[in-house]
Each structure stands twice: as C-alpha cells, then as structure tokens.
Amino acid sequence: MKVLWAALLVTFLAGCQAKVEQPVEPETEPELRQQAEGQSGQPWELALGRFWDYLRWVQTLSEQVQEELLSPQVTQELTTLMDETMKELKAYKSELEEQLSPVAEETRARLSKELQAAQARLGADMEDVRSRLVQYRSEVQAMLGQSTEELRARLASHLRKLRKRLLRDADDLQKRLAVYQAGAREGAERGVSAIRERLGPLVEQGRVRAATVGSLASQPLQERAQALGERLRARMEEMGSRTRDRLDEVKEQVAEVRAKLEEQAQQISLQAEAFQARLKSWFEPLVEDMQRQWAGLVEKVQAAVGASTAPVPIDNH
C-alpha cells in the first residue's frame, strides 16, 4: 500500500506534465465513489476501495502508468485486488446467511439469488477492466514505434465507462446487502419472539405454581386438607361427568346399531315377501294345470267304472 500511495502522489505531482490529457470526471462521480468506498467500512468495501484507487491511478495514463502497462504488473495488481474484493464479499455474504437462518426458505433463496446476481455483475465488470488493459498492452506492443495517442484516448474512454459501471455495481450491491442484512435482523427478532412466546406460558405456570406452593405452606393443616378434599371432589365430579358423557355416547352408538339392524331386517323381510310372491307367480299356473288334469282323470275313471257296473239285459225265450 505504501508503494501505491507513493505512486498516487507522484502521479498527482506529475499530472500537469503528462502527455495524455486527463479525462474530465462527471460531477456526480465523487458522490458515487463515496458510496462505493463504503459508508459502513465493511471489509469488502475497503477492498473495493483499494481496487478503486488503483483504477484511478491507471486511469491517469501518466508516463509511469504507460510504462507499467507494457508489463503484466498492472494486470497482476488488479487481479490481486479483484480476488481480495470477491473473497471479502463472499465472507460477508456467508456471515449474513448464517444470520438469515430463522427467515423463511423462500425469502432466503430469493435474497441469495439477487445478491449473487449483483456480485456476479461486479466481478464481470472488474474482469472487463483487466481485459481492457491486457488488450491495450497487446495493441501498444503491436504498434511499437508508432503513435499510440488514439489507443490511449480509446482506453481512457473505456475506463471512464467501466468506472461508472463499477460505481453502479457497488451501489446496487450495497443496497442488496442492506436488504439482506435487514432480513437477517428481522429473522433474528422473529426467532427471539417465537422463543419468548414459547417460554412465556411456562414461566407463568412456574410463577403460579410457586405462588400456590407458598400459599399452601402458610396455611394450617386443616385448611390444606380441606383444599385437598375439594380438589379431589372436583376431580371425582369431573371423572363422573366424563363417564356419563361416555355412557351417553355408547347409548347413542347402540341406538344407531339397533336402528341399522332393524332397517336391515325390514329390508330382508321385504325381499323375502317379494321372492315368495315371485315363486307363487311361477308355480300357481302349474298347480292349476295339474288340478285340471287330475280332475279330468278322475272323471274319466269314474265314467269307466260306471260303465262296467251297469246291469246286463237277460234274454227270455
């Protein structure tokens, strides 16, 4: 860091002699930078501030910066600062996730998804900064001995745009983390409230029991015996009431069973009568026919017997 601050100081003193014209910063960037470098001083915000300071130094495109851009030193420094920022951000996110345990699973998943998206955007834009510098180094080396004013102007424009994107990413990430932290605080308060609701009745019961034991200890033996007798009597009455209720339930069930049996018996009787009527309708014609045949047979037999018993006439000569 001492080397970094020394480089910044040298850049500031030599700014007037730089070959490249310094880019004009928008008026709103100081406020955004203040937000990006962290109002609460979280480790990830401090790490992002170090990345930010290094980017501002690179953005000056002073002679020293141009010399170092021809070597991989700048990109290595940016890589280190990027890794440090993302590491601190992941650690802070893990800490908030532990505090979010009492929150509903759906809410926790939604907040985690939004935070991961904001974190990914910040990482992608930081990676874009490094890629632009690598591309610039390659183009400068390819144009060795030629004018690189156009390349430097293009790089300065790209860095300004990327800087604005990084500011927006940092601001969005701070807002997401604030929502995440608020959810963790709300979940913790809800968990404490739930514990208080569970323990409240138990504490009240303990207090009542303690008061009862204290009052019983101060009463004479006769009063305690009388109170015990009343409690036993109340208990017996309660048991008797429960028994009567149970008997009433059994009676109702027996009555229901009896009604069902009577209904089934009536149905069986009706079915038997219907079956009897059906049998009668089947066999009645047959019986009548047999009776007719029998009557005819009897008449024939009687006629035959009458004919055989008639007197034979005697011939007198």
UniProtKB/Swiss-Prot annotation:
Post-translational modification: APOE exists as multiple glycosylated and sialylated glycoforms within cells and in plasma. The extent of glycosylation and sialylation are tissue and context specific.
Region entry Lipid-binding and lipoprotein association, spans: 210-290
Region (Specificity for association with VLDL): 278-290
Gene Ontology CC entries for this record: chylomicron; extracellular exosome; extracellular matrix; extracellular space; high-density lipoprotein particle; intermediate-density lipoprotein particle; low-density lipoprotein particle; multivesicular body, internal vesicle
Top-level taxon in the UniProt lineage: Eukaryota
Sequence repeats by residue range: 80-101, 102-123, 124-145, 146-167, 168-189, 190-211, 212-233, 234-255
Region of interest called 8 X 22 AA approximate tandem repeats, as start-end residue ranges on this chain: 80-255
Location relative to the cell: Secreted; Secreted, Extracellular space; Secreted, Extracellular space, Extracellular matrix; Extracellular vesicle
Keywords: Chylomicron, Endosome, Extracellular matrix, Glycoprotein, HDL, Heparin-binding, Lipid transport, Lipid-binding, Oxidation, Phosphoprotein, Repeat, Secreted, Signal, Transport, VLDL
Record PTM Phosphoserine, positions in chain: S147
Primary site of residence: secreted
Residue sites binding heparin per the record: L162, R163, K164, R165, G229, E230, R231, L232, R233, A234, R235, M236
Pfam families registered for this protein in UniProt: Apolipoprotein
Any one GO biological process: positive regulation of amyloid-beta clearance
Biological role stated in the UniProt entry: APOE is an apolipoprotein, a protein associating with lipid particles, that mainly functions in lipoprotein-mediated lipid transport between organs via the plasma and interstitial fluids. APOE is a core component of plasma lipoproteins and is involved in their production, conversion and clearance. Apolipoproteins are amphipathic molecules that interact both with lipids of the lipoprotein particle core and the aqueous environment of the plasma.
UniProt protein name: Apolipoprotein E
Organism the protein comes from: Macaca fascicularis (Crab-eating macaque)
